[in-house]
Amino acid sequence: MAAAVPKRMRGPAQAKLLPGSAIQALVGLARPLVLALLLVSAALSSVVSRTDSPSPTVLNSHISTPNVNALTHENQTKPSISQISTTLPPTTSTKKSGGASVVPHPSPTPLSQEEADNNEDPSIEEEDLLMLNSSPSTAKDTLDNGDYGEPDYDWTTGPRDDDESDDTLEENRGYMEIEQSVKSFKMPSSNIEEEDSHFFFHLIIFAFCIAVVYITYHNKRKIFLLVQSRKWRDGLCSKTVEYHRLDQNVNEAMPSLKITNDYIF
């Protein structure tokens, strides 16, 4: 029974300890998250401040070398603060009253000029720099052909140039004439082609006529026999004496042939 009682007591104690340990674990995780958020916010604020603040170095990087030289020359001409002397010569009063000497007071003009120079608006300086950048450089105006000071090239053509141009034109004309002559040899004109075609056509006709005459001359008898008609041949033969004799002999030998007009020679 005594052992069972402590076990029962340990159960509620462990149940109470579990939520406490979970809370401690959450707190331990929350601390690094909070630190990370603080670091990120600090980095963002620094970046924003850098972007908002104007950078005079960037402006100075865009300034060209002639403009920088001009600015340095102007700065050299201006008297520096150390060169301005605030001491003035002692003023001697002509009227001495009771042996009291008048104490000289320095004029406030140099100090006022220095304060005015120090109190100038930086935007005015930026505008001056932009104006210097936009204005053309004096060095480019003085030297047209580079820093070496070379003389300007004379673009006017002289008589030698004219002669050279004439020679080149003549050479080009000669080349063109040679090319045209070569083309005329290689490619005949259309007139020559037409004459050649007509010549071949006439030659073919003449050869055909010669062939016809040659054939008719060598086969004139055959052609004559083919052209002759039967009646025309009978008319020519009936007038001869030999034909009458032959006809009589045939009729006597074969009287049946009188009925027909066919004769066998």
UniProtKB/Swiss-Prot annotation:
Domain of life: Eukaryota
Positions with biased composition (Acidic residues): 114-123
Cytoplasmic compartment spans: 218-265
Subcellular location, principal: membrane
Region (Disordered): 73-123, 135-168
Residues exposed to the Extracellular side: 50-196
Transmembrane segments: 197-217
Comp. bias regions, Low complexity: 79-97
Keywords from the named record: Glycoprotein, Membrane, Phosphoprotein, Signal, Transmembrane, Transmembrane helix
Membrane topology: Single-pass type I membrane protein
Signal peptide: 1-49
A Pfam family assignment: KCT2
Cited InterPro entries: KCT2
Residue(s) carrying Phosphoserine: S229, S256
GO CC annotations, alphabetized: membrane
Keyword Glycoprotein: yes
Glycosylation sites: N75
Compartments in which it is found: Membrane
Organ and tissue specificity: Widely expressed.
Designated name of the protein: Keratinocyte-associated transmembrane protein 2
Origin species: Homo sapiens (Human)
